[in-house]
Amino acid sequence: MKDKILFYLDADFTHFTLAHFLQQKYDCEIYAIIDITNKPKEFFLKQKLVNFKKIWFVHDNIKLDNDTVDLEYLKKIEEEFGLDLWKIIINDRIFYRFFNFHKFSRNDLLSITEQFAKKFLKILNDIKPDFFILEQPALFHAELLYELVYNSKTKCMVLSQPKFGGKSLISESVRRIDNIETLENVPFTNRTENELMEYLKRKSQRKIFKKYYENQSNSKLQFIFAGLRYIGNNNKHEETHYTYFGRTKSKVVFSTLSGIIKKKIRERYMKKKLPKEFQEKMPYVYFPLAVDMERNVLIDAPFYTN
């Protein structure tokens, strides 16, 4: 019997490409749950590069018009899969503190959770995949699906970024090496501890990200063209994707311009007021300027978001 492999695909085509080459080298049945906006749907419906046995689109038929929520069903899901649904919900960048376009009610959150749980479990029960291949989840629905699969008999293969810049890790858990509980007892074989630390400094994620943003994010002309394309497009995402609820064009433009102005004001203040020389002998408290909307301080650290 052929292995059944379920892929989670999004706007990053890494896993679509993986599915394409995997199918050439391994005789298996490939399925896909696809998390994209409306416009790219046509590509996945017509493409012939990957022979998917069946595909599903994440946001299809997820609505906010459900007045009732089946709390007993959600309780059953928590007990069966060992989940704390509120912990996942409250640490999502869209549902809680960081999404300024729409405020979800308690009933909204539970209704969306119930709909996604039923949808995902029906897919999993229908195909019973042997493997689930995905990138590290970033949003609530992807994390919920991952948790449901992880706590079943299906083998997860999560592509994530370790602390070494330019490197990737495939494991069952995000950023954790399989079968290793702690790194303290792992012997150094090919490199000494000091050599590994030097390697870590050379392969810094910060350097990789800085180079990327310098190449991709500094063109004011591209920024203007992107804004004009956005204003001219007939987008309906705010009607079909909960991650876009309330994101009208006027609100998005205002939020973007407001963010640019605030950044300039704060940057000017920091350059003018904050000391630039570090006094090593003076007692200090280290307070990093955290990026709250990233997974590493939300889903990965659910009790440290304040």
List each model region and its residues:
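Structural motif
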Residues: 4, 130-131, 283-284
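Short, well-ordered alpha-helical microsegments
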Residues: 14-17, 40-41, 140-143
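Conserved N-terminal ligand/cofactor-binding loop architecture of enzyme catalytic domains
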Residues: 21, 25, 31-120, 163-264
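Conserved nucleotide-sugar donor-interacting segment of glycosyltransferase catalytic cores
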Residues: 119-180
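Active-site donor-nucleotide binding/catalytic segment of nucleotide-sugar enzymes
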Residues: 279-306
